[in-house]
Amino acid sequence: MPKSVIIPAGSSAPLAPFVPGTLADGVVYVSGTLAFDQHNNVLFADDPKAQTRHVLATIRKVIETAGGTMADVTFNSIFITDWKNYAAINEIYAEFFPGDKPARFCIQCGLVKPDALVEIATIAHIAK
């Protein structure tokens, strides 16, 4: 089955050569997502909860554009800039995954913009 590109309405232009998501064989792959506005400026610079909420809402939009829901998410890769934000990020994360949680990993690292606090990449399997 061929790959389909997923670009939700209102998406910002990526900073590099990639798209927000792709769909292949019922699997949605969501690119690393940060809390950016439509001009790739970081939103909520000092607020890990607001950034996480924005990131996950953006991911949800990509998955819904592909025909899925957040319940279809099977794996998240989470990148954070400071462990002090871990609890705040998890608090918002739990709101988006209230039932069975997807598998995931979380690492501390630098991100593409200095004010970015969290980046998440996602895989979801859409039921046929």
Swiss-Prot record:
Catalysed reactions, semicolon-separated: (Z)-3-aminoacrylate + H2O + H(+) = 3-oxopropanoate + NH4(+)
Top-level class of the enzyme under EC nomenclature: hydrolase
GO function term, MF aspect, one: deaminase activity
UniProt keyword Hydrolase present: yes
EC number: 3.5.-.-
GO CC list: cytosol
Alphabetical keyword list: Hydrolase
Pfam families: Ribonuc_L-PSP (PF01042)
Gene Ontology biological process terms in this record: nitrogen utilization; uracil catabolic process
Family: Belongs to the RutC family.
Subunit structure: Homotrimer.
Known function: Involved in pyrimidine catabolism. Catalyzes the deamination of 3-aminoacrylate to malonic semialdehyde, a reaction that can also occur spontaneously. RutC may facilitate the reaction and modulate the metabolic fitness, rather than catalyzing essential functions.
The protein's name: 3-aminoacrylate deaminase RutC
